[in-house]
Amino acid sequence: MVEFRAYQEEARYFKYAFNAAGKVVEEAPLIVTENGIVSRAMDASHIAMAVLEMPWEMFDEYEPPSDELMYGLDMEEVTRIVRRARVTDEITLEGEDEEEVIIKLGSSGYEREFRLRSIDIDDIPDEPELDFAVEVTVVPDFIQDAVRDADLVSDTVKVGAKGNTFYFKAEGERGRVIPKVQEGAEALLTFEVEEDVETAYPLDYLKDMIQAAQGAESVRIRLGQDMPLELTFRIGPAGEGKLTFYLAPRVEE
């Protein structure tokens, strides 16, 4: 018996969001309620956390369950499936008795159905509540380019704000890279800075996280001195949903 059904005519939003989350966490719960679908999970090393929120408004059709449901997902398997989505594909998520999640991809009458057995999830973390000194919103291209540029010279990147400038900074034996954007630039949609900040983060995680930018409308970045980095990718036709990552700072000796 189908317990819930969620349909969206553009599978690309889910393709990029699940692909990015699946690179960061190995297992994740899928919590389904009358308000939509939520997932929260930590990576095995507890360096990063992924929070996916898909309210019912994000879907073209949403049939909620009568009671809250929870499925456990092997994110590697989910990633393999959503990568198969074509540009023109629609996507449907369904669940049966908290035992199976069904993912349907297709268009124009051609449909592929994938079934995933629910796995046991031991712990569902709470989303942290943090007070950040810096909050900016950028176009997705900026953070993609900044992370890829930093990766040319180092495995660590410093993210910071000083005056009216928000920047990434990476240094290594091969050189130095400083992608930056100033208040008022088209790439910087919002800019709120209480104090100057600069904190280092591991690039290997960031390279995985920015995969979500391909399907995002915008990216909110929040940070503080020696605090976790928060990245929020707005997803969906009008940015109704969001994928948020938290990344612990890199302790420098």
Curated annotation (Swiss-Prot):
In terms of InterPro entries, this protein maps to: DNA_clamp_sf, Pr_cel_nuc_antig, Pr_cel_nuc_antig_C, Pr_cel_nuc_antig_CS, Pr_cel_nuc_antig_N
The record, for NCBIfam families, names: pcna
- An example Pfam family from this entry, by short name, is PCNA_C
The UniProt keywords, alphabetically, are:
DNA replication, DNA-binding
Job description of the protein: Sliding clamp subunit that acts as a moving platform for DNA processing. Responsible for tethering the catalytic subunit of DNA polymerase and other proteins to DNA during high-speed replication.
Which gene holds the coding sequence for this protein?
pcn
* Molecular functions per Gene Ontology: DNA binding; DNA polymerase processivity factor activity
**What family does the entry list?**
Belongs to the PCNA family.
This protein is called DNA polymerase sliding clamp
Domain of life assignment: Archaea
Q: How is the quaternary structure described?
A: Homotrimer. The subunits circularize to form a toroid; DNA passes through its center. Replication factor C (RFC) is required to load the toroid on the DNA.
Q: Name one GO biological process term.
A: regulation of DNA replication
